[in-house]
Amino acid sequence: MKDLSLDEDSDGVDAPRAAQWVDDNDTSGSGESAAEDSSTEASSSRLKTLQSNLSNLPLGALRKAQRVLKQVEPISDSDDSSGDELEDDTGESESEHEPGLGSSKGKEWSVKPRFDISKRSSKHAPTEVTSKRPVTRRRTVVEVPKLVARDPRFLPTAGEFAEEKFQKQYAFLTDAHKTELRTLRENLKRARKFLASSPREHREEREQEVYRLEQAVKRTESLVNKDRLDQVLREALGKATKEEKTKRKQGKGGWWMKESDKRELLTQARYEALAADGGSRAVKKAIEKKQKKVSQKEKKSRPYPPSRKKRRVE
């Protein structure tokens, strides 16, 4: 039995065998498919990690990244377009111009906006502007006079300002102010009556109406008082100038009133008019009010020594 088995083994060694040949393309294709599978898996895992990271990022960082990308995109587009244009220009120059005749020069300036100028860091920073701009082709051949708006009240053709004539022409304003004050006082009296007997839902509206009328009465009273005071001062100055004219006719030399004398004359005329309306008590009250105002002003301007804190003696 052993001899038979040895014979069979020796026969199998000498027997012809089939060669197992494998194409190299098949092996390389299988390797490439495996590499592609691994790369797709890696890219998908990378995308997942990026998405998870982006979802965890704050909105401020995302907005900043979007802003940076928007600034980078036009620059890259302009670079690509400039490269293409350069290639086209070189191709055209090689085809059109013969060697030895010289090359065409590019433009020194361009109307197209520049993308390499960065934006300002803040709105208070200075703006960067390109210096390569074309000179304007416009030329001023004929000088056109510029139209200036003028107020006809202050033209030399209107003449000088005459205060007496102005007061005569606009004397109706004082009467209008008095009539307006009388009407406003009547309306205020009526509004206060309505406020006293008004229901709760209309009370706030009527209070606002009363307040508005009170403010209007105060404004009109100040206008009427100013008109009366101006008239008193005008009459005082007119009386002084008339006396001076009569003295000059009698042979007195020229004399002009000083500012201090004028101020004293106007103060005296104001107090006389106040005494005519309210008596000596009103004049005394006005003088006390003026003195109090002056003393308060002096007190504010007075230098005070540094405050010393008193210590308690135990």
UniProtKB/Swiss-Prot annotation:
InterPro entries associated with the record: RRP36 (IPR009292)
Subcellular location: Nucleus, Nucleolus
Region (Disordered): 1-136, 239-258, 274-314
Spans traversing the lipid bilayer: none
One GO CC term on file: nucleolus
Pfam families: RRP36
Compositional bias (Polar residues): 46-56
Keywords tagged on the record: Coiled coil, Nucleus, Ribonucleoprotein, Ribosome biogenesis, rRNA processing
Domain of life: Eukaryota
Protein name: rRNA biogenesis protein RRP36
Lineage: Eukaryota, Fungi, Dikarya, Basidiomycota, Agaricomycotina
Gene field: RRP36
